[in-house]
């Protein structure tokens, strides 16, 4: 599983499967073995997965797309967050992870997904700066959840006092215009799996 976990960083087509396999490794079952064999057969039949970057004129925008499956795990009731980061029209990062806390509402789960996506976007901007590319625009974070956008655009917790305090940094980044949160239709959200 360690090898497919390493491979899953570069192969967005197996990201969700790798997440599920990693979750099963603390207590593997026969079903876990079937999953890893199925993944092995898939990788044998699809040995090459290539992200082809065509030339684009002036790719100066970082866009983060996020989506969350609220309480998707029937055992733990934890939500799954997924996302895509694009530089211009090129996809440069994808992920699918279980959230560490149990969300009490779908808006809260989507907010936690936006926090994850925003941290990835800001990390990519910092990497670009280290490579000598200054990026002074706001990072656009797109989601299909109005409630999560409302939480991100306010200051403080308001009526959602149960949100983890360490997740509220997103509000200050929105206020300082480092991030711009926009709503996208659920059918057009490319992070929706």
Task: Label the model's feature ranges.
Residues 1-51, 185, 192-193:
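C-terminal reverse transcriptase regions that engage the nucleic-acid substrate
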Residues 4, 61-107:
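RNase H-like nuclease fold core
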Residues 10, 28-31, 57-58, 77, ...:
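Secondary-structure capping and boundary motifs in well-ordered enzyme cores
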Residues 16-17, 73-75, 94-95, 151, ...:
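Short helix/loop capping segments that flank catalytic or ligand/cofactor-binding pockets
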Residues 24, 61, 97-193:
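RNase H-like nuclease module associated with reverse transcription
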Residues 32, 44, 78, 117-120, ...:
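Active-site-proximal structural scaffolding
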Residues 41-68, 133-135:
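Structured nucleic-acid-interacting core domains from mobile-element enzymes and related host factors
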Residues 45-49, 91-94, 123-130:
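Conserved helix-loop functional segments at active or binding sites
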């Amino acid at each position: 599983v360690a090898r497919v976990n390493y491979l899953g960083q570069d192969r967005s087509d197996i990201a969700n499967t790798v997440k599920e396999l990693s979750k099963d490794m603390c207590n593997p079952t026969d079903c876990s073995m079937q999953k890893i064999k199925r993944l092995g057969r898939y990788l044998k039949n699809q040995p090459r997965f290539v992200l082809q970057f065509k030339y684009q004129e002036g790719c100066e925008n970082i866009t983060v797309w996020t989506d969350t499956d609220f309480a998707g795990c029937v055992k733990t009731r934890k939500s799954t967050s997924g996302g895509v980061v694009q530089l211009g029209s090129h996809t440069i990062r994808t992920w699918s992870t279980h959230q560490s806390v149990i969300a009490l509402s779908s808006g809260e789960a989507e907010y936690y997904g936006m926090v994850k996506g925003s941290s990835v976007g800001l990390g990519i901007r910092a990497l670009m700066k280290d490579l000598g590319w200054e990026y002074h625009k706001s990072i656009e974070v797109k989601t299909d959840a109005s409630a999560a956008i409302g939480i991100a655009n306010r200051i403080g917790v308001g009526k959602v006092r149960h949100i983890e305090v360490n997740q509220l940094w997103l509000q200050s980044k929105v206020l300082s215009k480092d991030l711009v949160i926009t709503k996208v239709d659920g059918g057009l959200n490319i992070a929706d799996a």
